[in-house]
Each structure stands twice: as C-alpha cells, then as structure tokens.
C-alpha cells in the first residue's frame, strides 16, 4: 500500500482503470458514453472513512454518487430484536455483498439501482430503498469492503483510512449514541466482543490491499491529491 508521502508519485505514475457506461439521454432520446470510475474507501470503525467520503462528495456534488456497504447488511425480519443485537456485524457474512456486487456492475453498465437502507437502531434492513443513478464517480464506503475479491476487482482505486485505535473507539461511541440512537452498554459490549477482534482479523489486513493509505479522514494533503485525481478524471471527456 501507499502512504501519504507516496501520493504525488502514485498519481503521476498510475491511471485509474476506467470503464465506459452508456446512459439514456432523456433530453435527446439517444445515448451518451460516460466514463465511470469506482473508488473504494475502507478502514476501521471510526477511522474517518465517512468524513473523507463526504468531503469528496461535497467537492463534486453533481458528478459523485455514494454507496455505503453498511446498507447491505442482511435483512433479519425473521430474527427477534434481542437476538439481532447479538449478531456479529463485523464479520463479512453479515453483509449481502452479492447484492452490492450486482449493483456496482449495474451502475458501471449505466443502469440505476434501488439501494437498500439499513436501520441501525433496529439492527435490520428497512423496507425502504434509495433510487441511485449512475454518475461519473462512484464512491463505495465500508469497513469490510476489501474482504471480497469480487468487490476489489470492481474497484479502480482502493483507499484505506487509518487512525489510532483509541481515537477510533471514541468516535464510534459518540457516533452510535448521537447519530444512531444506540445504547452505550451495547456499544461497548459489541466493541469488545466483535468489533475489536474482527478488526484485526479482517479489516487491518486489507491495509496491504489498498492503493493508498490515508492517515485520518481530515488529512488535507491526502484529500487534495485525491480531489485533484478526480478532477483529472472528470476532465478526460
């Protein structure tokens, strides 16, 4: 993997693989060819993945769409709520990655998708979906994103966001309580029993599969370089 200091050389030497998607031109009734680049953003819980992803989305609001791997947690309608709380959500099997792969392929082909929505407070998939249209840049974010070789194959650029372990757990507690309405005791218990051990088993090893390693989601140098790369890709038409 590459670190922050490798960015200039990396982006001068390496061009992201680009696929061409064909979309229906609603205004002219024809089709247009559109370059599509998929960028994967991964890293441990609370590392700053979402911060980094949101900064990129904000920089290119009209050209970037975001897919969150978390929304692909399996539907658990047949499991009682108390039992859902005990599920190991930090294991790859907890995610319906087959559906994610299918959706990424559709987006690359210029097709829209109906993305599932996950309800963290209920530990279950919502019955609602989000309509997602393909765009020039597709950001895919998730803790376990790189564990599946099919996903890695679809990603043109792979970014791993790193952060100190203590900093990550503090961020997770704050986020899950304030943003996801979860119980503090449950958060701490989950971290000790599944999040921490699964991080070292599945997440951290993926650091070596990343093209770029970013130290913190608020790393301005890394953000500026990735933003410049995206700008270059958008100007290639």
Model-inferred region functions:
Residues 62-77:
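Short beta-strand-centered segment that lines the nucleotide-binding/catalytic pocket of NTP-utilizing
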Residues 126-179:
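ATP-dependent NMP and nucleoside kinases share a basic, alpha-helical "lid"
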Residues 79-120:
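Conserved nucleotide-sensing/catalytic segment adjacent to the nucleotide-binding pocket
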Residues 133-134, 174, 196-237:
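NTP-dependent small-molecule kinase module
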Residues 49:
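Conserved lysine of the Walker
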Residues 44:
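P-loop (Walker A) phosphate-binding loop of NTP-binding proteins
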Residues 10-33:
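Short, Lys/Arg-enriched N-terminal segments with co-localized hydrophobic residues
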Residues 52:
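Hydrophobic positions on the alpha1 helix immediately C-terminal to the Walker A/P-loop
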